[in-house]
Amino acid sequence: MVEFRAYQEEARYFKYAFNAAGKVVEEAPLIVTENGIVSRAMDASHIAMAVLEMPWEMFDEYEPPSDELMYGLDMEEVTRIVRRARVTDEITLEGEDEEEVIIKLGSSGYEREFRLRSIDIDDIPDEPELDFAVEVTVVPDFIQDAVRDADLVSDTVKVGAKGNTFYFKAEGERGRVIPKVQEGAEALLTFEVEEDVETAYPLDYLKDMIQAAQGAESVRIRLGQDMPLELTFRIGPAGEGKLTFYLAPRVEE
């Protein structure tokens, strides 16, 4: 018996969001309620956390369950499936008796159905509540380019704000890179800074997280001195959903 059904005519939003989350966390719950679908999970090393929120408004059709349901997902398997989505594909998520999640991809009468057995999830973390000194919103291209540029010279990147400038900074034996954007630039959609900040983060995680930028409308970045970095990718036709990552700072000796 189908317990819930969620349909969206553009599978690409889910393709990039699930692909990015699946690179960061190995297992994740899928919590389904009358308000939509939510997932929260930590990576095995507890360095990063992924929070996916898909409210019912994000879907073209949403048939909620009569009671809250939870499925456990092997994110590697989910990633393998959503990568198969074509540009023109629609996507449908369905669940049966908290035992199976069904993912349907296709268009124009051609459909592929994938079934995933639900796995046991031991712990569902709470989303942290943090007070950040810096909050900016950028176009997705900026953070993609900044992370890829930093990766040319180092495995660590410093993210910061000083005056009216928001920047990434990476240094290594191969050189130095400083992608930056100033208040008023088209790439910087919002800019709120209480104090100057600069904190270092591991690039390998950021390279995985920015995969979500391909399907995002915008990216909110929040940070504080020696605090976790928060990245929020707005997803969906009108940015109704969001994928948020938290990344612990890199302690420098």
From Swiss-Prot:
<dbReference type="InterPro" id="IPR022649">
    <property type="entry name" value="Pr_cel_nuc_antig_C"/>
</dbReference>
<dbReference type="InterPro" id="IPR022659">
    <property type="entry name" value="Pr_cel_nuc_antig_CS"/>
</dbReference>
<dbReference type="Pfam" id="PF02747">
    <property type="entry name" value="PCNA_C"/>
</dbReference>
<keyword id="KW-0238">DNA-binding</keyword>
<comment type="subunit">
    <text>Homotrimer. The subunits circularize to form a toroid; DNA passes through its center. Replication factor C (RFC) is required to load the toroid on the DNA.</text>
</comment>
<dbReference type="InterPro" id="IPR046938">
    <property type="entry name" value="DNA_clamp_sf"/>
</dbReference>
<dbReference type="GO" id="GO:0006272">
    <property type="term" value="P:leading strand elongation"/>
</dbReference>
<dbReference type="GO" id="GO:0030337">
    <property type="term" value="F:DNA polymerase processivity factor activity"/>
</dbReference>
<comment type="similarity">
    <text>Belongs to the PCNA family.</text>
</comment>
<dbReference type="GO" id="GO:0003677">
    <property type="term" value="F:DNA binding"/>
</dbReference>
<keyword id="KW-0235">DNA replication</keyword>
<dbReference type="InterPro" id="IPR000730">
    <property type="entry name" value="Pr_cel_nuc_antig"/>
</dbReference>
<comment type="function">
    <text>Sliding clamp subunit that acts as a moving platform for DNA processing. Responsible for tethering the catalytic subunit of DNA polymerase and other proteins to DNA during high-speed replication.</text>
</comment>
<dbReference type="Pfam" id="PF00705">
    <property type="entry name" value="PCNA_N"/>
</dbReference>
<dbReference type="GO" id="GO:0006275">
    <property type="term" value="P:regulation of DNA replication"/>
</dbReference>
<dbReference type="InterPro" id="IPR022648">
    <property type="entry name" value="Pr_cel_nuc_antig_N"/>
</dbReference>
<protein>
    <recommendedName>
        <fullName>DNA polymerase sliding clamp</fullName>
    </recommendedName>
</protein>
